[in-house]
């Protein structure tokens, strides 16, 4: 089973909105095979908290215009990693440091990438571990460097 077409269409709106606010390395990942609660992750990088906030505002505005409201929001106090849960898809807007540290790209590197017309293709991490096939916890990839505060 793969992501529902409506989820793909709606997550594409989010990806394009993030691109409008200069979000980088935008990944639209079909996580439906490994997640029972959602079909798609949209993962976006931003340079700083201000840009995270701008991207989140644009994504919410575009999706609201399309008739969608998030079921849940997390992280919109510090704007380092904001999660917008729309049920069938989840938008993660992260500072580059948080994206590297928490490693969603590494955890879901085996999931299919959904191409979005007009957006630069997502670049997968060069090295990744097939995390669903490891037999020992020591074989799991470690997190990146601890993120620093924006000054």
Pin down the residues of each PLM region.
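Signal for well-folded cores of large energy- and translation-related assemblies
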Residues: 19, 23, 27, 60, ...
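A contiguous, mid-protein "functional segment" used to position or interact
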Residues: 86-121
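Compact, glycine-rich, soluble single-domain proteins
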Residues: 51-68, 83
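Glycine/charge-rich, flexible interdomain linkers and switch-proximal surface loops
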Residues: 25-37, 71-88
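Short hydrophobic/aromatic beta-strand micro-patches
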Residues: 43-45, 94
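Intrinsically disordered, low-complexity charged/polar segments
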Residues: 122-151
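N-terminal presequence-like segments and adjacent domain-start helices
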Residues: 1-7
């Amino acid at each position: 089973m793969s992501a529902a077409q409506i989820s793909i269409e709606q997550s594409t709106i989010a990806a394009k909105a993030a691109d409008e606010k200069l979000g980088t390395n935008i990944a639209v990942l079909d996580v439906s095979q490994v997640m029972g609660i959602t079909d798609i992750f949209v993962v976006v990088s931003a340079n700083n908290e201000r840009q995270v906030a701008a991207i989140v505002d644009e994504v919410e505005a575009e999706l609201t215009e399309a008739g969608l409201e998030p079921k849940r929001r997390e992280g919109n106090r510090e704007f380092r990693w904001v999660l917008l849960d729309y049920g069938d898809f989840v938008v993660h807007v992260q500072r580059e440091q948080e994206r590297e540290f928490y490693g969603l790209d590494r955890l879901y590197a085996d999931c299919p990438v959904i191409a979005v017309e007009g957006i630069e293709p997502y670049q997968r991490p060069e090295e990744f571990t097939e995390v669903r096939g490891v037999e020992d916890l020591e074989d799991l990839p470690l997190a990146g460097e601890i993120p620093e505060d924006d000054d």
